[in-house]
């Protein structure tokens, strides 16, 4: 999927790589893409008068890419360098290493970038087969944020679809009644659209220390968590992650490890839901002799949220902080566009901000405590340390 994302920009039935790059850049636009564990996203930012140009180019890339052999040879080397660069950054590579170990036996164990061995086996024919299997309209969502009349946008998109996907119709999604998700059906679909069954036995909690030639130690503490289908628990854990290690300087772990004890520069808590499982992690980097003390303080903070419910004031403040962060993020048109597309792919609808706000506001301290007890119990957590 990741190599395919790179190769989409290397040639279509009517354009070479340079022409693809120039088409939007010549009018001040941007064209980019990224791959996650469960999706590929190709996106463009342009002036509204250039929307047609952008939409047609995106569909041209997705449906008529040719994967020239000479470009594939070069792009393999580019991805090799990307892998090396990633491995040279322990703060990044430890996340990948942790997921590989935590999700052993599950598709999530595989690194997005691949390996030199797996990349060497991928030929142009492999990528073409992948394109025709997965890049079909039933697997896609087109998201547009623009200061334009909806009818104008629909006309542009449907015209491009007729050009590159004859017979395909554009279903317009505004606000709709959410349908209950079934575990395993958000993302992770087969080419025919049905849920891909998984036969997977989770690995038991582990603690692994790996000697690395780095000046600093890096540590991840984490566990499997909730999927997209578990809405109340997912929202509660997202709020807990923000309380413990969100971007604010007053996050609890940052206050204890950095501000009070000067043990770390960076500490963060992250929750990533997937279609059939999820991942909760806490990461910090510190001087090697300080690892155990830092771990003890992290454990103490986790035990605080497990043993005692948040006060009504602390809960209200935490909700206000998260809602403020979400509102500010939604002011970014590109972020809003990407979020809408992801919501369509996962849930089949776009949730208004007011609905999200109401759901977060309705969370109770007892719900957060129950989620903390289920996910954050120390004996359930796995630990990976680069020393």
PLM region descriptions:
Residues 17-172, 209, 216-219, 225-228, ...:
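Charge-rich, well-structured scaffold segments of protease-associated domains
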Residues 1-24, 98, 221, 232-244, ...:
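Active/ligand-binding-proximal structured segments within catalytic/core domains
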Residues 172-178, 182-183, 192-250, 343:
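His/Glu-based metal-binding/catalytic segments typifying zinc-dependent metallopeptidases
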Residues 3-4, 166-167, 177:
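Intrinsically disordered, low-complexity regions enriched for glutamine and histidine
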